[in-house]
């Protein structure tokens, strides 16, 4: 990679990102602009995928809201995300948990890793 591009991307990387994997339950504090004011909206769900690397890394969080599955994809190093909290670590054997989209209720649960 070009050294100039590499130095620019390294300066934009965030260092306050916790270590999380697919299967973990996270709370994402995202800044939302409504009209002329800005507020923080918390989106809590299971990480179903992480893709990319460096400045272009993204992760997808899935939750069930009023019986409807909602997925949101966030860039990992964006300033629009105030912070990420890892609520619990899940035990899964896949990197992409897209199969959770077809499951409902207790079948969609993920075992927790005990430490």
From Swiss-Prot:
In alphabetical order, the GO MF annotations are: structural constituent of ribosome
CC annotations in GO: cytosolic large ribosomal subunit
Disulphide connectivity of cysteines: none
Query: Keywords of this protein's UniProt record, alphabetized?
Result: Ribonucleoprotein, Ribosomal protein
Question: Does the keyword section mention Ribonucleoprotein?
Answer: yes
Please name the PROSITE patterns in this protein's record.
RIBOSOMAL_L19 (PS01015)
One family from Pfam that matches here is Ribosomal_L19
Q: Which InterPro entries match?
A: Ribosomal_bL19, Ribosomal_bL19_CS, Ribosomal_bL19_sf, Translation_prot_SH3-like_sf
GO:BP terms for this protein?
translation
Against PANTHER family, the record matches this protein to: LARGE RIBOSOMAL SUBUNIT PROTEIN BL19M, RIBOSOMAL PROTEIN L19
Annotated HAMAP family: Ribosomal_bL19
Tell me its family.
Belongs to the bacterial ribosomal protein bL19 family.
Protein name per UniProt: Large ribosomal subunit protein bL19
């Amino acid at each position: 990679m070009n050294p100039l591009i590499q130095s620019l991307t390294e300066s934009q990387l965030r260092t306050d990102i916790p270590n999380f994997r697919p299967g973990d339950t996270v709370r994402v504090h995202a800044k939302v602009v409504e009209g002329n004011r800005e507020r923080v909206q918390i989106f809590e769900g299971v990480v179903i995928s992480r893709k990319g690397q460096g400045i272009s890394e993204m992760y997808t969080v899935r939750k069930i809201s009023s019986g409807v599955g909602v997925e949101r994809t966030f860039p990992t190093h964006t300033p629009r995300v105030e912070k990420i909290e890892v609520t619990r670590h899940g035990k899964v054997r896949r990197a992409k948990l897209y199969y959770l989209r077809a499951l409902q209720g207790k079948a969609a649960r993920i075992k927790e890793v005990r430490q």
